[in-house]
């Protein structure tokens, strides 16, 4: 059973700030104040490419977590420290994928609004989620996590 002492004390569900930035940006762009981002037709293909890369990275991350018998759920404790697959080059490949979706959606929508919200999104994820996950991982895996943190960057 997962108790508050053996799981991260995450404040928010990580995809929510990303989704809010995309949906809020779309709504503002269409209903209040357009903030166009170049020629939508020319940039949309790049946006779809970013979303495709994000989906592949997300799937690879999920498969790696599953292979190690641990969870993607930010409200549950980690059962294993994943240091291979996408976790060999990023400590947060799922949030990196979320960032690719945010950027891709901005290009697909041809709206700069999601990118305007990006600093607030990254701040919310950094302090509302990652800080708590990292504290949990260090408390759970100790020196193994500290070595991993020294070896692998947070993003890329």
Q: Which functions belong to the PLM regions below?
A:
Residues 92:
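Extended, alpha-helix-rich binding/interface surfaces that flank or overlap catalytic cores
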Residues 1-84, 96-156:
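Membrane-anchoring alpha-helices and their flanking helix-loop junctions
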Residues 87:
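Solvent-exposed interhelical
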């Amino acid at each position: 059973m997962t108790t508050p002492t053996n799981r991260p004390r995450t404040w928010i569900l990580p995809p929510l700030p990303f989704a809010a930035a995309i949906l809020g940006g779309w709504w503002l762009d269409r209903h209040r104040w357009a903030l166009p981002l170049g020629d939508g037709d020319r940039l949309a293909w790049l946006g779809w490419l970013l979303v495709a890369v994000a989906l592949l990275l997300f799937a690879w991350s999920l498969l790696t977590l599953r292979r190690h018998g641990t969870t993607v759920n930010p409200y549950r404790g980690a059962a294993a420290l994943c240091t291979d697959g996408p976790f060999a080059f990023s400590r947060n490949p799922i949030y990196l994928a979320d960032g690719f979706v945010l950027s891709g959606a901005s290009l697909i929508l041809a709206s700069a609004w999601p990118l305007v919200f990006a600093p607030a999104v990254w701040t919310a994820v950094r302090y509302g989620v990652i800080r708590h996950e990292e504290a949990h991982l260090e408390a759970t895996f100790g020196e193994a996590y500290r070595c991993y943190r020294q070896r692998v960057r947070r993003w890329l």
